Amino acid sequence: VVTWERSGGEFDGKSPHASRLSGDQLTAGEHPEFPVSEMSPLSDGTIYSLFFQGIDRAGNRSEPTVIQGISYDVTPPAISGLSPPDSAYVNHTRITYELSEIMAEGSVIWTQIAGESDPRSPHVVDLMEGERIGGAHSDLTLAAAPLLKDGGVYRISVEGVDAAGNR
């Protein structure tokens, strides 16, 4: 039996979620991924403990194996409040943005769209750990700010992936 039990985060009124393994799932050895059927959906934003317990053909129960602190997250991160806005005239590379959650990885991309030719465009700057924290980041000079072409017109975008792999 595989059981997901809420241990924190968002409320899950259907917890615990249990499913019986069957067929090839019951064979000895490693099973890196397998679908769990006949189980109600988990709740986004909930933290679960995962319990595995088996019974052999003689009816002997195994000791339960428990994995704690599994965050179930299916919501893509939201990136908002990006500044400077399109068509702004600036003489710096400071930006403002807001992240809905901590990002596992992220980047800011300056893509030239007009003006003086910039053969190095697009400029992709990976966000450092402190720049990926959830919340507002105001008038920030990135640790690895790009060297943009004077007279270039750029579109700025921010991309990110959260710890669950949501983009």
Predicted regions span which residues?
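Short, solvent-exposed loop/edge segments of extracellular or virion-exposed proteins
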Residues: 80-90
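Solvent-exposed loop/turn segments flanking beta-strands in beta-repeat/beta-sandwich domains
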Residues: 1-17, 98-121
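Structural beta-strand segments of beta-rich domains
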Residues: 91-95
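Flexible, low-complexity linkers/stalks enriched in Thr/Pro that connect modular domains
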Residues: 56, 66-80, 162, 166-167
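Low-complexity "stalk/linker" and mucin-like segments enriched in Ser/Thr/Pro/Ala/Gly
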Residues: 9-26, 87, 115-135
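Conserved structural position at the C-terminal beta-strand
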Residues: 52-54, 158-160
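Signal that preferentially marks extracellular ectodomain short beta-strand elements
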Residues: 22-47, 57, 129-153, 163-164
